């Protein structure tokens, strides 16, 4: 394995571990020293991911949503039929968010940069539901409806 491939894999593993820790316990109460100790790595290793705790939280939040999006879309791609795809999409989104503890969600809401990432991804998810509805209309599976309105109803 080449050095860049190893570095990329190791970086992904570290982000996965940071995300798992944050999802389980939140992040506001953790210091970089505590994060490093919990992950059994050095603080300098964490600094290869981000220059500060705040930037680490932001980067981990982005990493989480990228991985969640990939997992959700893989599940949707495996299903045929407009209704089934929408149901699978919503179930997959729920499954992706299931590991998020109440503390993580509270910390996310309290930290504006991470909250903005969450809100942006929520808007993207609502747009994806609109796309799935529009695909169903185009395929004749649904009546022609205002997709944005229908997506808002589904998301509520």
PLM features per residue range, with description:
Residues 50, 55-64:
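Alpha-helical DNA-contacting segments of helix-turn-helix folds
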Residues 39-50:
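Short hydrophobic/aromatic patch on the recognition helix
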Residues 91-131:
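Short secondary-structure transition hinges
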Residues 1-25, 29-38, 54-58:
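Basic, helix-initiating cap at the start of DNA-binding domains
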Residues 59, 70-99, 151-154:
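Hydrophobic alpha-helical connector segments
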Residues 24-27, 48, 142:
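Helix-turn-helix/winged-helix DNA-binding modules
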Residues 77-80, 122-154:
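Hydrophobic alpha-helical bundle segments that form small-molecule/ligand-binding pockets
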